[in-house]
Amino acid sequence: MPVQCSNCEQKRAVLKRPKTGHSLCKDCFFWAFEEEIHQTITSAGLFNRGETVAIGASGGKDSTVLAHVMKLLNERYDYGLKLLLLSVDEGITGYRDDSLETVKRNQQQYELPLKIVSYEELYGWTMDAIVKQVGLKNNCTFCGVFRRQALDRGAMMLNVDKICTGHNADDVAETVLMNVLRGDIARLRRCTAISTSSEGDGAIPRCKPLKYAYEKEIVLYAYFKKLDYFSTECIYSPNAYRGHARAFLKDLESVRPSAIIDVIHSGETLSVKEGVKMPVQGTCSRCGYISSQALCKSCVLLEGLNRGLPKLGIGKHHRLHGKILAQEPLTEQEERKLKAVDF
C-alpha cells in the first residue's frame, strides 16, 4: 500500500527525508526544505534589505540549489536583496570549462548577472599548469587558497556587500572532523560559523545559507525540481584529504543519521582554553590580502611556483624558507640546494 505524506496526509509520499525520517510528497518536501533555509537566514540575520549579494556559482548541485532558493526566497519574503552570480575559473580542462557552461545557462534561467574571474587572470597560473608542477598530492591546497582569494577579489570587482556560498551540512561536518584530525585550533574555532568576517579586516563577509541542509536532500531537491546542474567530480580531487573525512562521516551517518548535525553542534559548542595563542589577523605586505603572516598563503604559494619551488608553502619549512619569504636574494648555490629539496 502506498505511503501517505506525513505532513498533508493527502498525497502519496515520494521520499523519506534523510534529515528527519519523515515521509513527504514533493510539494511538502519543497516547502519544508525552503522554509528551513528561510529560518536559517532569518534566525542568523544573514542579510539586510538593500544589500548586494554575490552567490558563489560553480554549476554544481549545491550552488545551483542555492541560487534557485535564494532567488525564490528573496521574492517570496521580499528580502530586498540584489543577487548576482560569481564564478571562479580555475583552469581545469574537461571539468571547469564544462561546468561554467552550466553556470551560463543558470544565469539565463534565473535572470541574474554573472561575473567570472580566472586563476590565469589573477595569478598567471591555471590549475592544469599547477598540477604539472606539484602533482596530484597537494594540488587541492593551491586550489583552496587561490579560490578563496579569487572569490573575494571577484566580489570586490562587483562591489558587493556579502558573498554566500553553497557549503552544506555535510561540508561543515567534514571540515570540523578535518580540523580535529589536524589539530588546527584556529580553523576549528571558526569553521562552524554561519557568517564569517572580522571587524576592520577588509574582507567581504561570507555566509552559508545551506549550513544545516543535508547533501542528500540538496540532491533530492535538485532532482525533483529538475534543476540544471553539473554533476561531475573534479578530476584532481580523488586524493584530497577531505575524502577521508567524508568516508568516515558517511560510515557514522549509516549508523546514526543525526551524526552530521551532531558533529556540527559539537563544533559550535567547542571553546578554546584561555592562554591558547591564536593567530592575529593582519594584512599581506605584498598584495594587501588578510593574513596572519607577513605574506599571505596565496603569495607564498605563488612565490614557490614562480621560483620553480612549488612545494615551498606546503609541509616542512626549509632553513631558507624565511629568507625566501623576506624576499631576500638567494645565491646560486642556495637556489640549487632548494630545487633539490623535497619539502
Swiss-Prot record:
Function description: Plays a central role in 2-thiolation of mcm(5)S(2)U at tRNA wobble positions of tRNA(Lys), tRNA(Glu) and tRNA(Gln). Directly binds tRNAs and probably acts by catalyzing adenylation of tRNAs, an intermediate required for 2-thiolation. It is unclear whether it acts as a sulfurtransferase that transfers sulfur from thiocarboxylated urm1 onto the uridine of tRNAs at wobble position.
Family, per entry: Belongs to the TtcA family. CTU1/NCS6/ATPBD3 subfamily.
EC number: 2.7.7.-
InterPro entries: CTU1-like_ATP-bd (IPR056369), CTU1_C (IPR032442), Ncs6/Tuc1/Ctu1 (IPR000541), Rossmann-like_a/b/a_fold (IPR014729), TilS/TtcA_N (IPR011063), tRNA_thiolation_TtcA_Ctu1 (IPR035107), UPF0021_CS (IPR020554)
Taxonomic classification: Eukaryota, Metazoa, Chordata, Craniata, Vertebrata
Protein name: Cytoplasmic tRNA 2-thiolation protein 1
SUPFAM superfamilies, per database record: Adenine nucleotide alpha hydrolases-like
Entries under CDD domains matching the protein: CTU1-like
Broad class of the protein's primary localization: cytoplasm
